[in-house]
Amino acid sequence: MSSGGLLLLLGLLTLWEILTPVSSKDRPHFCHLPHDTGPCNRNTQAFYYNPVYHTCLKFIYGGCQGNSNNFKTIDECKRTCAA
């Protein structure tokens, strides 16, 4: 790659770093997982972080398995992922 191409790449990476919100860099990786109801049928209200809308949303959790993007309260979701 030519020095001009490397300079362009460096400039684009720098611009991307500047434009990426700090909060999304510090957010735990599991906050970007889709909500997962799991295979059980307990059907309890839970909350997950939606990275597209940058907010916590309600969903019905089956009560077992699923993933870590699963919170008992909206406040817990906000403290963990939306702060």
UniProtKB/Swiss-Prot annotation:
Signal peptide span: 1-24
Domain of life: Eukaryota
Disulfide bonds: C31-C81, C40-C64, C56-C77
Alphabetical list of Pfam families matching this protein: Kunitz_BPTI
Family matches, as SMART domains: KU
Tissue expression per record: Expressed by the venom gland.
Domain BPTI/Kunitz inhibitor: 31-81
Localization per Swiss-Prot or TrEMBL: Secreted
InterPro entries according to UniProt: Kunitz_BPTI (IPR002223), Kunitz_BPTI_sf (IPR036880), Prtase_inh_Kunz-CS (IPR020901), TFPI/VKTCI-like (IPR050098)
Function, in words: Serine protease inhibitor.
Similarity comment text for this entry: Belongs to the venom Kunitz-type family.
Protein name, UniProt field: Kunitz-type serine protease inhibitor tigerin-3
Protein species of origin: Notechis scutatus scutatus (Mainland tiger snake)
